[in-house]
């Protein structure tokens, strides 16, 4: 009795179909992985720029010779999320918390709980002359002619160029509250008196 030949079915085999599905899944996985990495890179880039790369311009010569008029500084916006401003820090703040006011750049000379007074051109903190002072005699004492006691959230700031600075000595500025501070000025771009570099 003659054997009947089996007919081969047309179309792709089961193994080929499984291979094609596996290939498509791998491509999809690689695409999703690439999209995820791009998203992470963009997110980190934006976060770094926001945290360390926001710029502010110095207005006037109140911070000379360290910073000159029009010189740009970079703001570290997360520095004071983990620690408080320290004496000697150069900060960026909005005077009186006014969102429409131009950002101001000044140096912290006294911190919460300190007493401040300007006596005969000398800045006196807690009864001692401010040793970190690199400025000339502070002729205009302003409101600091009388002793000032800083509250638990207040800072006393001055410009390095005391003869041309509107700062905490002025009744228009006064003590700076923590909520007014945008961040720490940590890097300056090239200016007329200096190359780009970290702010000391």
Regions found by a protein language model. Name each.
Residues 144, 148-200:
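Beta-strand-rich cores of mature extracytoplasmic or soluble domains
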Residues 103-128:
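Mid-length scaffold segments of soluble, non-membrane domains
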Residues 125-143:
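PP2C/PPM family metal-dependent serine/threonine protein phosphatase catalytic domain
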Residues 71, 86-90, 114, 154, ...:
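Structural motif
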Residues 80-81, 97-99, 116, 123-124, ...:
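Solvent-exposed loop/turn segments at secondary-structure junctions
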């Amino acid at each position: 009795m003659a054997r009947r030949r089996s007919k081969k079915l047309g179309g792709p085999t089961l193994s080929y179909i499984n291979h094609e599905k596996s290939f498509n899944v791998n491509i999809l996985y690689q695409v999703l992985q690439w999209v995820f990495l791009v998203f992470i890179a963009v997110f980190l880039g934006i976060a770094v720029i926001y945290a360390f790369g926001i710029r502010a311009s110095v207005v006037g010569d109140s911070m000379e010779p360290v910073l000159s008029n029009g010189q740009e500084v970079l703001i570290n916006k997360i520095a004071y999320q983990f620690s408080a401003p320290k004496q000697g820090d150069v900060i960026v703040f909005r005077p009186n918390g006014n969102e429409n006011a131009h950002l101001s750049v000044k140096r912290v000379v006294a911190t919460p709980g300190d007493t401040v007074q300007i006596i005969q051109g000398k800045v006196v903190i807690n009864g001692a002359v401010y040793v970190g002072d690199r400025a000339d005699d502070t002729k205009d004492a302003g409101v600091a002619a009388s002793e000032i006691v800083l509250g638990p959230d207040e800072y006393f700031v001055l410009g390095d160029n005391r003869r041309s600075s509107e700062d905490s000595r002025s009744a228009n500025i006064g003590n700076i509250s923590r909520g007014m501070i945008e961040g720490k000025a940590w890097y300056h771009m090239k200016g007329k008196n200096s190359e780009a570099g970290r702010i000391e």
